[in-house]
Regions:
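Small-residue-enriched hydrophobic alpha-helices in membranes
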Residues: 1-49, 56-229
């Protein structure tokens, strides 16, 4: 059963009058949520709220989501249904973000980083980065408790084209080479596609993990080269 079929089933479980935000409560109530379904719905739902925030609700949303997910033509309707439900839902994006953070729990920080990374991919899909999108993503990061270097790293990578290598590895610029190496090894493990899938990243979005792994390795190469100079 494809993830898009499972998402359709999750949406169908909503009772009449319930908004899409109730999906997150339903998944959380199951004890161990189907994390890949939850992740996918979360990215599309927050992506829809972000599109509404900048007023560009028709700016090629399917094409934008393809920067994160592999979406077969036959499953575009399922992705579009989630997008439209979120766009029409009266609940604010902050209510979504709070429910999403609660759903993944305290151990879900890496999933939330993946999610924010995906939203940056969507925000920059049209070649522009609007002030409203910037404010939106900053607020989501605050709700997710992804402060400081983590947020700066993602923003710099997607908007400026290059992130500070110390931010990428979650380090202060004064960190020793030994600490940088340890942080790099830890980040490589966390960014491995198999580990990412185990924590909830759907295989359809594996390019996020691959992109993150490249960024982590590039950061270590940059730091080690600077120290060797």
């Amino acid at each position: 059963m494809s993830i898009w079929t499972r998402i359709t089933a999750a949406i169908a479980s909503l009772t009449q009058g319930q908004g899409l935000a109730a999906v997150f409560d339903n998944l959380r109530a199951n004890g161990t949520p189907e994390k890949s379904v939850a992740f996918t719905i979360a990215v599309i739902a927050l992506g829809a709220k972000m599109a509404k925030a900048d007023g560009q609700v028709t700016k090629g949303e399917v094409a934008a989501f393809r920067r994160v997910f592999t979406i077969p033509r036959k499953d575009e309707a399922a992705a579009g249904r989630v997008f439209n439900l979120a766009r029409q839902d009266l609940a604010g994006f902050d209510a979504y973000a709070i429910k999403i953070k609660a759903m993944f729990g305290e151990a879900g920080r890496e999933v939330l980083i993946d999610l924010l990374d995906g939203l940056f991919h969507i925000a920059t899909a049209d070649g522009e980065f609007h002030p409203a999108e910037d404010a939106f993503l900053y607020e989501v990061a605050q709700i997710f408790d992804l402060h400081g270097g983590c947020y700066r790293s993602l923003r710099a990578k997607h908007v400026d084209g290059k992130a500070d290598p110390y931010d990428v590895l979650g380090l202060d610029a004064s960190a020793s080479l030994q600490d940088a190496r340890a942080a790099w090894r830890k980040a490589v493990k966390e960014s491995h596609p198999d580990i990412a899938i185990a924590r909830g990243l759907p295989p359809e979005a594996i390019r996020l993990a691959e992109d993150r792994l490249r960024a982590v390795n590039a950061a270590w190469e940059d730091i080690s080269a600077r120290r060797a100079a």
